[in-house]
Amino acid sequence: MVGGFMKRRNFIFGALAGLGALVDGAGLLVRQEKFGRAPSGERLARIQASRHYVNGQFVCLEPVEMMTEDLPDEEKPNRIETIYRVLFGGDDGRVPKEAIPSSKTDLHAIPREQNVAIWMGHSTFYLQIGGRRILVDPVFSDYGSPIFFINRAFRGSNVYTAADIPELDVLLITHDHWDHLDYATVMALKPKVKEIVCPLGVGEFFEQWGFDLAHLHEEDWDTDIALADDFHIHILSSQHFSGRFLTRNNTEWCGFAIVTPRRRVYISGDGGYGKHFADIGRRFDGFDLAMMENGQYNMQWHAIHMLPNETAQAAEDVRARILLPAHSGKFALALHTWQEPYRELLKESAGRPYRMVTPRIGETVDVENPADFPNWWEGMA
């Protein structure tokens, strides 16, 4: 009897010790610099003064639920099961069996006066507009998460490194999620970045990481940042959320408009479909190029990640001349097959008043007169 008691006691103590070690390990993990810290002081005061900050968190222009309940009861999947399948589930065609094809352009060799866009996988883009070099949401790491075994990049999708990037006039960050704000990448780019533009709260990361605040432009939605008389960046609303761990929505998320005397470029950032797209299209009288989210969607969260038919409509709403899809081709963050976003958006774009281009990673899109690109994903497993 005493022996049984001792075994139970040892089991309980062992379990508590294991739990304590797990908690301590998690505590050490989240204290790493890459997790960032909550906004405070003057930055927090600016955040609290925003009309988009309500009851201690940022909110979208229209009330939305992150996980919607649009499906009939008998078709509603279990949320925990869905998230588990996304993070740890089997292949199911979500990850390509072959390497993603690429064509690595030498960025240093592109004349500055040439207006181009280069997709680098997922939502990372290199742009040259109005003689400026711009990098959007750079993620050159092998994982789009803080944990090495979650959200691994597709084979072949990481062809660029910070060493390949020329000196940048502007670094644009749409929000703080790991697949858009990557600590290792931005730290490697640090010596090359002249100006940073980001939404409210995201500047806290750059301050903690030692960037020069004199070159940080951290503003609310509907702010026009004039980096020069002939070069403006507008921070615009999107329908999404933020957070790098348990705390949600203490930093803002956004899209961008880049405006020069000759060209206008739109970057949607992550987000669901809403009337803000038509408002943006009217406000800027259309765009020469729109880089729009298309991928990692699901009916359970389509309020914060557009479905392909919604992306097609959004591109029409913003009056895009050229549509360049984003948020696919590198990470599996949903249950659809990796090719589906391209196939569905191509189908939904038929007959629309814009031209959809589908370059491989690293191929140059000439904003003035884009080439025809093949459907490179077809025939791949």
Predicted regions and their residues:
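Acidic/histidine-rich helix-loop elements
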Residues: 140-157, 243-247, 298-304, 332
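Catalytic core of the metallo-beta-lactamase
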Residues: 122-128, 226-287, 302, 306-310
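Divalent metal-coordination and catalytic microenvironments
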Residues: 127, 137, 175, 233, ...
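Cap/insert and terminal regions of metallo-dependent hydrolase folds
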Residues: 7-14, 30-33, 42-47, 53-55, ...
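Active-site metal-binding loops of divalent metal-dependent hydrolases
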Residues: 138-140, 176, 238-239, 269-271, ...
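Metallo-beta-lactamase
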Residues: 2-5, 10-151, 158-161, 164, 199-267, 344-363, ...
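Active-site metal-binding motif and surrounding structural segment of the metallo-beta-lactamase
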Residues: 50, 150-197, 217, 285-291
